[in-house]
Curated annotation (Swiss-Prot):
Family, similarity comment: Belongs to the OXA1/ALB3/YidC family. Type 1 subfamily.
InterPro entries in the record: Membr_insert_YidC (IPR019998), Membr_insert_YidC_N (IPR028053), YidC/ALB3/OXA1/COX18 (IPR001708), YidC/Oxa/ALB_C (IPR028055), YidC_ALB_C (IPR047196), YidC_periplasmic_sf (IPR038221)
CDD domains named among the record's database cross-references: 5TM_YidC_Alb3, EcYidC-like_peri
GO cellular component: plasma membrane
Record Pfam families: 60KD_IMP, YidC_periplas
Segments crossing the lipid bilayer: 7-27, 338-358, 417-437, 455-475, 494-514
Gene: yidC
Record protein name field: Membrane protein insertase YidC
Biological process per Gene Ontology, one example term: protein insertion into membrane
Subcellular location: Cell inner membrane
Protein keywords: Cell inner membrane, Cell membrane, Chaperone, Membrane, Protein transport, Transmembrane, Transmembrane helix, Transport
Record organism: Actinobacillus pleuropneumoniae serotype 3 (strain JL03)
Membrane topology summary: Multi-pass membrane protein
Keyword Membrane included in the entry's annotation: yes
Length: 542
């Protein structure tokens, strides 16, 4: 029985330590001011360099100037395009506010103190993105807005050189963060034209600032035919450049709840690359050479995703793009849990209630394991007098003691691990729930009731963590404790306090789950102990 309780304590401490360690990496508030000061102090230059074509060693030089900007706006997305090169230099997510209760949209792509842009163009023999500079596209007007009743908007930008007409078209769709970026090359000459498409994302090579609501991790990722999903951090980029030839795939720049990604033609052979240069990290792709015969034309397609980690829409955009919602090793549990969470939310229309609903469902499913755990622990308690007698009888003869204990367990039909296995089974589920709540952009700025207006942020008044600690204390008092070792007793007594401190700065959605879980456990434990009392396996007297 002592070993069961010790295992429970060690397991909870281990899970808490792992979660708290990860949280410190993602949410460390102490470095926020320092990192933000670094970002503000360094003004990154807007780099216009593009990748070299296949079998070329040159790198395109930076442009000293920019063209004018053009704004494209749908119901959920506003893009700012630089006509010099046709790069996306800003993206505003109109359905996501920058801060709670703010009317300012969240800005994903941006320029200024830091660079975070999505570039694309054409290199190669007749490419217009060269060492001489970037193309200055012409566009009909400065602002384009998706009209009411219109589901799609196409905005062409044109550039003509040496008898070849290049048209770069952006296609925005209603309710979508998936933007089609297509090149049409119309060869009006008597010579063959060869171009090679590319798309890349550039980001100022600085550690991201941490906060309580936004984690510090920002880095690259890619997908290839061989690897469904692979993170490639800025540190990885500084150590070695990516150079992967693959069919299909994509490249991306990840933040906590948001992602920008280039998705090339999935039927073509592409090269995925990365590099760092002048304080800028770049991850991108280069497509195959496209040959356009005289007096003919060709269209090269690609997609740009710049928006929240919407799993359903990302999955429809490109294979494995939804894996940027990173559940870690517990993904096979977290995915169905997230599906359950969204299903319940569609009924109750409140994410806090959905968390409570998921907790109830999970605890109900696990109830047989919980009952088996408490029953096994109760049977072990009943054997404690006999076990103590054996210890006194056999003393230091551990082999004989072990043999007699195994014999006793067999006669009494008690599994000494019966109280441990249910605990071990439930731990991965808790970890999966943790990542589900931490990765769900749906919880960002999602209100519950009263003072909880953002389930992704800490409780501003620490009420939920304190209630959670109180529920742990009550649960501990309800549980029979045969522990006699003073050190173990102190650890057990200190656990509710320690957990309360851990959870003071955790997202309120996660604390709400733990509090609900404790309350359900208290009810289940009361029911189980009442049943055990009837069987003579439990007594309320301690």
């Amino acid at each position: 029985m002592n070993s069961n309780r010790s295992l429970l304590v060690m397991g909870l401490l281990l899970v808490s330590f792992l979660i708290f360690t990860q949280w410190q990496q993602d949410f460390n508030p102490e470095i926020q001011a320092q990192k933000q000061a670094q970002q503000q102090a360094q003004v990154a230059s807007q780099s216009g360099d593009v990748p070299a074509a296949s079998n070329a060693n040159t790198v395109i030089a930076e442009n000293a100037t920019q063209g004018k900007t053009v704004t494209l706006e749908s119901d959920v997305l506003r893009l700012t395009i630089d006509t010099l090169g046709g790069d996306v230099i800003a993206s505003d997510l109109l359905a996501h506010n920058a801060e709670l209760n703010s009317q300012t949209p969240f800005k994903l792509l941006q320029t200024g103190a830091t660079t975070y842009v999505a570039q694309s163009g054409l290199v190669g023999k007749n490419g217009i993105d060269t060492n001489a500079g970037r193309p200055q596209y012409q566009v009909a007007q400065d602002t384009f807005v998706l009209a009411e009743g219109q589901n799609e908007m196409s905005v062409p930008m044109t550039f003509e050189k040496d008898g070849v007409l290049y048209t770069k078209t952006f296609v925005l769709k209603r309710g979508s963060y998936d933007v089609a970026v297509n090149f049409n090359v119309k060869n009006q000459t008597a010579a063959t034209v060869e171009v090679q498409p590319y798309g890349q994302i550039k980001y100022t090579l600085l550690e991201s600032s941490g906060s309580l609501t936004m984690p510090t991790y920002t880095g690259g990722a890619y997908s290839s035919a061989e690897t469904n999903y692979k993170k490639y951090s800025f540190q990885d980029m500084e150590k070695a450049n990516l150079d992967i030839n693959t069919k299909a795939g994509w490249v991306a720049l990840l933040q906590h709840y948001f992602v920008s990604a280039w998705v090339p033609n999935q039927d073509a052979e592409n090269t995925i690359y990365s590099r760092t240069n002048n304080g800028i990290a770049t991850i991108g792709y280069r497509g195959p050479v496209t040959t356009i015969a005289p007096n003919s034309e060709a269209t090269i397609t690609s997609q740009l995703w710049t928006g929240p980690k919407d799993q359903k829409e990302m999955e429809a955009t490109a294979a494995n793009l939804d894996l940027t919602v990173d559940y870690g090793w517990a993904w096979f549990i977290a995915k169905p849990l997230f599906a359950l969470l969204t299903f319940i939310q569609s009924i109750v229309t409140n994410w806090g209630l959905a968390i409570i609903g998921v907790t109830i469902v999970v605890k109900t499913i696990l109830y047989p394991l919980t009952k088996a755990q408490y029953t096994s622990m109760a049977r072990m308690r009943m054997l404690q007098p006999k076990i103590q007698e054996m210890r006194e009888r056999f003393g230091d003869d551990r082999q004989r003691m072990s043999q007699e204990m195994m014999k006793l367990y067999k006669e009494e039909k008690v599994n000494p691990m019966g109280g441990c296995l249910p605990i071990l089974i439930q731990m991965p589920i808790f970890i999966a729930l943790y990542w589900t709540f931490m990765e769900a952009v749906e919880l960002r700025h999602a209100p519950f009731f009263g003072w909880i207006q953002d389930l992704s942020a800490q409780d501003p008044y620490y009420i939920l963590p304190l209630l959670m600690g109180a529920s742990m204390f009550l649960l501990q008092k309800m549980s029979p404790s045969p522990v006699t070792d003073p050190v173990q007793q102190k650890v057990m007594t200190f656990m509710p306090v320690m957990f309360t401190v851990f959870f003071l700065w955790f997202p309120s959605g996660l604390v709400l789950y733990w509090l609900t879980s404790n309350i359900i456990t208290i009810v289940q434990q009361w029911l189980i102990y009442r049943n055990l009392e009837k069987k003579g396996l439990h007594s309320r007297k301690k």
